[in-house]
Amino acid sequence: GTSGMWGDVGHHTVLNGPRYRGLVEDIFLKGRLSDDMSLYVHRPSVTDPTCAPEGGDTFYALSPVPHLGHGAQVPDWAEIGESYRQKVQAVLEEQLLPGLGEHLTASEMFTPETFRDRYLSPHGAGFSIEPRILQSAWFRPHNVSEEAEGLYLAGAGTHPGAGLPGVISSAEVLAQLVPD
């Protein structure tokens, strides 16, 4: 949360780092946290002003990082978490939100360990399975289990996909599939 507003920032913003393909390979293939980053920034207060106090703004910044299943090279988030958060803030201030640090009133950081421990997500993956073409949309696990009779699935790791629209759609599909 902030005590100031950035009226020129839209609801969704993507800040691509200098080497997008290399960054994606570092994160998803090598399990390495790189020196550079790309960020997705969500500003819900632009479409729903009740998300922030009057005169303030609300932002969510997502920095893709390796999940915990990559082994020894995975960062120790207890050790580097705050410095990484500061690095994200510096990128935001430089590229999108000048003066953010002076107006920051609340901040919360989620790491892969948060997703693992709080949400029981395997390897701390924030959005379930990897964002590869053969794990997207139709290729995700379907809502009716093929292995266990009577098992129905909904959520970010199932068809149709991750993100709030995908999760809600998954629940709507499931509501039609489960017998009365």
Tell what function each PLM region has:
Residues 66-75:
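Amphipathic alpha-helix from the class-I
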Residues 34-42, 94, 98-160:
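A glycine-rich dinucleotide-binding beta-alpha-beta segment and adjacent secondary-structure elements
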Residues 3-5, 27-36, 52-54, 75-117:
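Flavin-binding catalytic cores
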Residues 1-53:
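Mid-domain catalytic core of redox enzymes
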Residues 1-6, 56, 76, 80-87, ...:
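C-terminal structured subdomain/cap of oxidoreductase catalytic cores
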Residues 65-67, 157-158:
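Short, histidine-centered active-site or binding-site loop motifs used for metal coordination
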Residues 51, 71-72, 163:
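Extended hydrophobic-aromatic, low-complexity segments
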